[in-house]
Amino acid sequence: ERPLMIAGPCSAESEEQLFNTATKLKNNGIEVLRAGIWKPRTRPNCFEGVGVKGLPWLQNIQKELGMKISTEVANAHHVEVALKYGMNMVWIGARSTANPFAVQEIAESLKGVDIPVLVKNPVNPDIELWIGAFERLYLCGITKLGAIHRGFSSYNSTRYRNMPQWQIPIELKRRIKNLPL
């Protein structure tokens, strides 16, 4: 069985950028487009995403190209409007995964919704925090879960922006055997 490929821009910046990217991805066999609509930033006055105005762009791609669409959600409002615009799946970002209150809010807002929810590892290498996010979602009845390993931030300069620390996703897979990673 072919692995599910999800691809797209980190940030949706314009309708044209998103549609051009989606067209190229579809022509290369990608079935799911991902695009960040809201971008949590460390410091103020940085690009924080286009917000809700980008959701119709994704919806248009879904209708015109037949691709599945997904975006990151960080709170109940994001979930509500993402679902309103027909997201086929959502993901919880690394910063949100690190906040149990945010994960709980998202989990509660997804109760009764039957779409996949992917969870990025937290920014810091804490497997219990990552597992806790899955537990919160599962306890709210969300069963279509998957993990995204993006690596972990480091204070020091390193070869990679995010250090893989492979032992953590390997341990996650050992502890939650049927979890897609």
List PLM regions with ranges.
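Catalytic cores of alpha/beta
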Residues: 15-20, 76-85, 126-134
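Glycine-rich, proline-tolerant flexible connector loops at the mouths of alpha/beta enzymes
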Residues: 34-53
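Catalytic alpha/beta core domains of metabolic enzymes, predominantly
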Residues: 106-181
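Catalytic beta/alpha-barrel core
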Residues: 48-50, 67-79, 88-102, 115-127, ...
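Active-site mouth loops of central-metabolism enzymes
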Residues: 3-20, 43-49, 67-73, 93-94, ...
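Conserved, mostly hydrophobic/aromatic
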Residues: 8, 25, 33, 82, ...
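Short, well-ordered coil/turn segments that N-cap beta-strands
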Residues: 2-3, 29-31, 63-69, 86-88, ...
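Charged helix-capping and loop-helix junction motifs
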Residues: 48-56, 161-168
